[in-house]
């Protein structure tokens, strides 16, 4: 049996302002070169989202030699496309709704109260960039975690291939969606 990370994950195009460049450099630095694999890892983690990051930091703190493999951006969907972006936009819309109803509370606002969607999106990008510092490659490296970018494929019960390199391990954890395919029997 082999496990492959699905190929439908990709790095979405984003505006390249200073805030986005900061975020991308923390989550997948331009010009990144995967490290030379260790002879054997105590733990290989596939997926650099919240679960993978917590597992990597925790195992490294306990003394394990850890490799983390991510296909796209560290931080996963939650930071980059899901939870964080949606919650910041939801907060803006709720605030607008509260301000629109300010008269109920004895406050008055201009009649032409409007949401500047461009400013709301810029706020979301700033928040994402700030949070990305906690999920950064530098923080993982400081913890002693080897970070590899690329597609992961198990090629034996104790090894995974990523970007042409073979990573041997004692234990592995898939913390992102994976596809299971039965190999030759």
Question: Locations of the language-model features?
Answer:
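Glycine-rich Rossmann-fold phosphate-binding loop(s) that bind the pyrophosphate
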Residues: 47-50, 71-72
């Amino acid at each position: 049996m082999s496990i492959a990370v699905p190929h439908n994950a990709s790095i979405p195009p984003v505006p390249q302002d200073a805030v986005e460049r900061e975020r991308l450099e923390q989550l997948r630095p331009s010009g990144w070169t995967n490290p030379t694999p260790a002879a054997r890892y105590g733990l290989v983690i596939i997926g650099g989202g919240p679960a993978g990051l917590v597992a990597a930091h925790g195992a490294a703190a306990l003394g394990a030699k850890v490799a983390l493999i991510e296909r796209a951006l560290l931080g996963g969907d939650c930071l980059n496309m899901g939870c964080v972006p949606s919650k910041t936009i939801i907060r803006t819309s709720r605030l607008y709704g509260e301000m629109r109803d300010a008269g109920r509370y004895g406050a008055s606002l201009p009649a032409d109260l409007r949401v500047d969607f461009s400013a709301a999106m810029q706020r979301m990008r700033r928040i994402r960039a700030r949070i990305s510092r906690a999920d950064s490659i530098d923080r993982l490296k400081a913890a002693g975690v080897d970070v590899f970018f690329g597609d992961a494929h198990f090629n034996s019960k104790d090894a995974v291939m990523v970007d042409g390199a073979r990573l041997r391990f004692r234990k592995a954890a898939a913390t992102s969606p994976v596809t299971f395919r039965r190999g030759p029997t």
